[in-house]
Regions:
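Conserved N-terminal boundary motif of the eukaryotic protein kinase catalytic domain
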Residues: 19-31
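Conserved hydrophobic alpha-helix
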Residues: 159-163
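Catalytic-loop of the protein kinase fold
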Residues: 165-180
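C-lobe/activation-segment region of protein kinase-like
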Residues: 186, 190-297, 304
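Conserved structural core of kinase catalytic domains
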Residues: 102-149
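ATP-binding glycine-rich loop module of kinase domains
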Residues: 13-15, 28-29, 36-106
């Protein structure tokens, strides 16, 4: 009997192969076991309710795809339904300005076409699945050369420029949310992203504590002492994923600079800082990954990313 394993698991999603003939833990076998009679298929502009669909025939041999099963989530009260809606709504919004370039900047990709509609996701009985291009290597798992590191910076900054041009914030930029895929570095996991014009979503604090500036949380009413407590909890929970970072000299250096920065921002509040939070996260990634891989990084470029936060390295 075949063994099997899931590819990765985060707070919101569990990733698995769409189809793997050598593994019995994949999307194909889940559908085979559950045998749903009715499924909801999600296109970018249309949702289809399909009954008695021979779904296995659409999944079989799709070994160039992975599937993200949306979970309830941890720590923060949530639900799989809400998390799925958040991610699909964000995906549809970025599709509006990326359109045919979406696969260049993201791993989001339709697995099949049904009734002339490209299908990007599927659900049944509160089970939710989003389809993605099959790629595995996230930044913390890559041994960079200088040329490859420079390419990563260029690729991701190009994505951030496009998001900022369209007033969109990914809001959860970190090492395991950037992936190397077909000679391109792409941002993944869009469930926390939002349009800066969305007043409702901008009222809530979301995103990773370690790669977000404390002022973001303070500005939403979270006292710094409580931020420090939550940060401590998340470090404990994510320790296996982030221990590579906690040992870095640059991590300790940036902790001091960030403390000075948040005190300055509280004393003299900045205007329109929200649109720069992804830049701050990206600057930290560049600094930490450079030390981890013993590489140089473009100091002037990073200082420019950090400028709105009054940080100079």
């Amino acid at each position: 009997m075949l063994g099997g394993k899931n590819i990765s698991e985060g707070y919101v999603g569990l990733t698995m192969d769409a189809y793997n003939k050598y593994d019995n833990i994949d999307f194909y076998n889940i559908i085979k076991k559950d045998n749903p009679k009715t499924v909801i298929l999600y296109g970018m502009k249309k949702t289809i309710k399909a009954t008695d669909l021979n779904l296995l025939s659409y999944i079989e041999n799709k070994d160039n795809f992975i599937v993200k099963k949306i979970k309830r989530g941890n720590i923060i009260i949530s639900s799989a339904t809400r998390n799925f809606k958040n991610e699909m709504n964000s995906i549809k919004k970025i599709y509006k300005f990326m359109k045919n370039n979406m696969e260049e900047y993201t791993t989001i990709k339709p697995m099949f076409n049904y009734n002339n509609i490209d299908i990007y996701a599927l659900s049944y009985k509160k089970n939710y699945f989003i389809f993605q291009e099959k790629c595995f290597n996230t930044l913390e798992n890559i041994k960079f050369t200088q040329d490859e590191f420079d390419k990563m910076i260029k690729d991701i900054y190009g994505s951030l420029e496009l998001l900022q041009k369209n007033r969109f914030l990914h809001n959860d930029l970190k090492a395991d949310n950037i992936i190397h895929c077909n000679n391109k570095y792409k941002i993944i996991d869009w469930d926390k992203s939002y349009h800066l014009n969305n007043i409702f979503k901008s009222l809530f604090v979301r995103g990773n504590f370690l790669f977000n500036h404390p002022y973001k949380f303070y500005n939403k009413g979270i006292p710094l002492f409580f931020y420090d407590f939550l940060n401590f909890i998340f470090i404990k929970l994510d320790y296996k994923k982030i221990k590579w970072m906690l040992k870095l000299k640059s991590y300790k250096m940036m902790k001091g600079k960030i403390t000075e920065s948040v005190n300055s921002l509280i004393h003299d509040p900045p205007k329109n800082i929200n649109k720069y939070y992804d830049n701050f996260s990206f600057a930290l990634l560049i600094i930490f990954l450079a030390e981890k891989n013993n590489l140089d990084f473009p100091k002037d470029f990073v200082n420019n990313l950090l400028k709105p936060f009054r940080i100079i390295i």
